Amino acid sequence: GRVRSYLIKNRIPYSEKPHATPHYHNVVLPKAGGRRGIPTIEFPDGRVIRDGVAIVDHFESLNDNLHSPSTVRQSAVSRLLDAIASEGLLRPCMHYRWNHDQSNREFLQFHFETIYKDHSNPSKMAADRMQEIRENVNPAWGVVPETHDLIESMHVALLTKLNQHFSKHPYFLGSKPCIADFGMMAPMYG
């Protein structure tokens, strides 16, 4: 979400490719240090950058830091809000994505089948990966039945505050997006 929104806002052309392809495993992954991660970007010259923050920072350096606040205070606030958004909101993101089957299952199945479309049985691979996330990844992030109510109440309180802010300002720090706005897209997308 962070990188996609940054690229769209800055009219930087891109195309998304599934990360479960032979090209990804044989070409991109070794250049990314053997560490899987989404997002990972491969440039036409073969360079690879893995991690949303690193990708946005790369384009910011080429873009005269267009979305990086110029004052120390605003820069610190922007980076703090970015970290809170992209890391601190991961738990509610995972909860709402994976614990509401009636509204999300079809989307998730489609999404994961798309990732594995070049494999012999994309439906089975998608189902297996989804089960792995539910059974292992979510509990590792503290997304367990005992925390669902707390996650939801804290998330609703935060959304209420964000709604109050964004009803007066189009972005976190005023009239143009900053790094925090792109970071907020990470947990809000999908």
What are these regions, as identified by a protein language model?
Residues 91-190:
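GST-like fold's C-terminal all-alpha helical module
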Residues 1-121, 172:
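GST-like domain detector, emphasizing the conserved glutathione-binding G-site
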